[in-house]
A protein has these predicted regions:
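Short, intrinsically disordered or compositionally biased N-terminal tails of bacterial proteins
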Residues: 1-10
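Cytosolic, long alpha-helical scaffolding segments
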Residues: 9-24, 29, 35-360
Length: 360
């Protein structure tokens, strides 16, 4: 029986709490054997003959996990009971929270006779607009059942993020085009596209919450280590904010159909293209895990303040107050895009700084 005492391991070296030592045994040929802690076997419900997966991490560590955990699709179910007094958006928030927590089947049932029409409509709207991979499999006045059909491995976090970024950038470009052309219809399409970005954002949060509980799934869904989960969560939020700023500008175009002066629009376009370039640089540094590229993106983003000030100086002469307000609103939102790009690059620095250290 191996010593489980955290004070030492028989060699005069102290162990961290929870650590145990095992002796390597040589069986001849090219095989070595090491025993596994009995409690670990029991906790996971393993038995003789079951397979385990061994994954090498770095130069000196191995990760051992039950092979069944690779492909296990845990069917988690939850039921929400609602009363007639419950605001439909109270139900929606609870539904989203359960989606985030990784539940596969969610049933909404009434405490009284039936769900109100307004409650049912909001639930269906949330499923359609927000909960990616979710379908309504049963629908009646006495209850609605949702099932998350998309599998963890069907769409990796990396792939979901790329698609989310693509939509956000497309919204941003269309916003600029609608400003240049004074195209209210195109601005309206930008506003509608925001739901799609939110869907990807919620999906990414759900996948990260599931994966962080099962370390082996991290690599399966495209992540390298648990600490990257927080980084991805923050990056996804920043991209979501980029889309939000595109929506703010588009709504301004819809509400103020009178075009801005051409010379001002050209200056705004130049600033806008620059902010988009910073966003591209920051996200590329993330995909490539490139510390130096992320650092350059941060430095580049600093120039956006001066571009904004230059535009505001150009319109400082007396002019229509509403026009001045609009220009300030638009340039502020463009500046925020560059700032969120800088935030993304800073997260990449934190995720990749270890790569820059000299190995001793």
């Amino acid at each position: 029986m191996e010593n489980n005492n955290s004070e030492g391991n028989g060699n005069g070296k102290s162990l961290l709490q929870g650590e145990e030592t095992r002796k390597l045994q040589y069986t001849g040929g090219s095989s070595y054997i090491v025993s596994l802690p009995k409690k670990w076997i029991q906790d996971l419900g393993l038995k003789q003959g079951d397979h385990v997966v061994i994954l090498r991490q770095g130069n000196s560590m191995l990760q051992i996990a039950p092979a069944s955990k690779r492909v296990a699709r845990e069917q988690r179910e939850a039921t929400i009971e609602v009363s007639k007094e419950n605001n439909p958006y109270f139900i929606a928030r609870k539904l989203i929270a359960l989606y985030f927590l990784g539940f596969n089947v969610i049933t909404i049932v009434p405490k009284e006779d039936r769900l109100l029409v307004e409650q049912r409509e909001v639930i269906k709207s949330i499923v359609r607009r927000v909960l990616m991979g979710t379908e309504i499999i049963a629908d009646s006045a006495t209850g609605i059942t949702l099932q998350v059909l998309i599998n963890l491995l069907d769409l990796s976090v990396d792939a979901a993020f790329k698609r989310m970024l693509l939509i956000a950038k497309s919204m941003y470009r269309d916003t600029l085009l609608s400003l240049q052309e004074n195209n209210v219809e195109l601005a309206g399409e930008v506003v509608k596209s925001d739901d799609e970005v939110d869907r990807f954002s919620f999906y990414i949060v759900r996948q990260l919450k599931i994966a962080i509980k099962n370390e082996h799934l991290l690599k399966e869904i495209g992540l390298e280590e648990p600490r990257n989960c927080l980084g991805y969560r923050l990056i996804a939020k920043s991209v979501e904010r980029v889309a939000d700023h595109a929506v703010v500008i588009s709504k301004d175009i819809i509400e103020n159909p009178h075009p801005l002066k051409k010379d001002i629009v050209e200056k705004i376009a130049s600033m806008s293209y620059f902010a988009l370039q910073v966003l591209d640089d920051a996200c590329l540094s993330m995909f490539k895990r490139d510390y130096e590229a992320a650092d350059k993106a941060i430095e580049k983003a600093r120039k956006i303040d001066e571009m904004e000030k230059a535009i505001l100086r150009a319109v400082s002469k007396p002019r229509d107050v509403n026009e001045l307000y609009r220009i300030k609103l638009i340039t502020e939102n463009i500046r925020r895009v560059a700032e969120y790009a800088s935030d993304i690059a800073e997260i990449v620095l934190n995720m990749t700084v270890q790569q820059t250290l000299r190995k001793g």
